[in-house]
């Protein structure tokens, strides 16, 4: 667990990875993803309202826009649940810090009244400095806990500054947002990551089209892993143009049933069967599929190599499936 501290946004990553493991169960993945997006939208709406923009359509519009954006980002297979948690966390830090700030300013006002200082609290510079210090600390804490979620926090603070643009102290608040961004640069030597990753971890996401071809590949891969071979065969035979990964699993199942020669030329560019080319540019997905081939062949040396490469080639990979395969290999080899 301590390895999560090697990157910013450790709480978002830890929470996201913990919830991601439940994707293993049917219908759990869509449920967790939907609830996470709704939670992010709810926190953003409440954050906008805490910025004193209430009773209008703006908070709901911004929340819907953020949730729509997260849905579009989630179409990319590499967009992690941790990124959604980071956005929700950034908005939550703003809500929490705002409530503490209001309570602190009320406490200061009581102290002034007790001291018989009749000057209004809004007429002194003390509240401005309290607000600036609160924003400064919250930005750094938000980056440590939620990484890129600090941009949501900064956006909500900026929204509040726009709301009260004519009030004194706006420049102080803007400085309190900007200064931590430069201080975070010093964390580069702490985390040993580039500047882009430092400010965007665990990931901002990008707009992509639905990757239906990859979805079919992962569906075939998962069904094969769970031993639903007939379902994999039916899935591939119904597809008019199965991709190379789908044909690989089709050939692998046929080979186990001793019927590979009969189906080898059923699809174009399928004459190599279960043979694949390995090299420096081999995709991680190919390495994972070859892991299943080596396991069926009983070659534990290459199977172990493929399982380890599948983890090494993917940064921050905590793939329980490959860890389980390494444990299975140790049981077969007697290394326990």
Task: Show the residue positions of the predicted features.
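Membrane-interface coil-to-helix junctions
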Residues: 1-19, 23-35
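Membrane-interface alpha helices of multi-pass inner-membrane proteins
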Residues: 109-110, 123, 131-144
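Transmembrane-helix signature of polytopic, membrane-embedded enzymes
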Residues: 48-68, 123
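Transmembrane-helix motifs of polytopic, lipid-linked glycan transferases
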Residues: 34-52, 89-99
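Soluble catalytic regions of membrane-associated enzymes that act on cell-envelope
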Residues: 198-336
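Membrane-interfacial, low-structure loops and terminal tails that flank and connect transmembrane helices
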Residues: 52-53, 101-126
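Hydrophobic helices that insert into or interface with lipid environments
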Residues: 139-215
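Aromatic- and kink-enriched transmembrane "portal" helix at the membrane-lumen/periplasm boundary
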Residues: 66-84, 143
């Amino acid at each position: 667990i301590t390895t999560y501290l090697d990157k910013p946004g450790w709480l978002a990553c830890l929470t996201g990875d913990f919830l991601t493991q439940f994707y293993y169960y049917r219908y759990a993945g869509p449920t967790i993803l939907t609830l996470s997006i709704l939670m992010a939208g709810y926190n953003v709406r409440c954050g906008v309202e805490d910025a004193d923009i209430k009773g209008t359509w703006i908070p709901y519009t911004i929340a819907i826009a953020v949730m729509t954006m997260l849905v579009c980002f989630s179409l990319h297979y590499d967009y992690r649940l941790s990124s959604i948690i980071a956005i929700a966390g950034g908005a939550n830090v703003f809500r929490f810090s705002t409530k503490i700030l209001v309570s602190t300013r009320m406490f200061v006002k009581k102290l002034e009244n007790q001291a018989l200082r009749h000057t209004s609290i809004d007429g002194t510079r003390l509240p401005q400095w309290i607000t600036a210090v609160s924003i400064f600390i919250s930005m750094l804490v938000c980056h440590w806990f939620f990484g890129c979620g600090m941009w949501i926090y900064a956006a909500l603070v900026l929204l509040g500054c726009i709301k009260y643009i004519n009030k004194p102290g706006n420049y102080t608040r803007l400085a309190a947002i900007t200064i931590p961004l430069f201080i975070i640069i010093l964390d580069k030597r702490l985390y040993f990551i580039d500047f882009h990753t430092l400010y965007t971890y665990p990931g901002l996401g990008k707009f992509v089209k639905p990757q239906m071809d990859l979805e079919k590949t992962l569906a075939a891969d998962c069904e094969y892993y769970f031993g639903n071979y007939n379902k994999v065969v039916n899935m591939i035979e119904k597809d008019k143009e199965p991709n190379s990964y789908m044909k690989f699993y089709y050939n692998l199942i046929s080979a186990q049933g001793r019927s590979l020669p009969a189906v080898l030329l059923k699809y174009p560019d399928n004459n190599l069967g279960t043979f694949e080319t390995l090299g420096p540019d081999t995709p991680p997905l190919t390495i994972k599929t070859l892991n299943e081939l080596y396991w069926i062949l009983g070659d534990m040396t290459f199977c172990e190599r493929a399982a380890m490469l599948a983890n090494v080639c993917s940064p921050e990979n905590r793939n329980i499936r490959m860890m389980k395969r390494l444990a299975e290999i140790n049981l077969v080899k007697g290394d326990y």
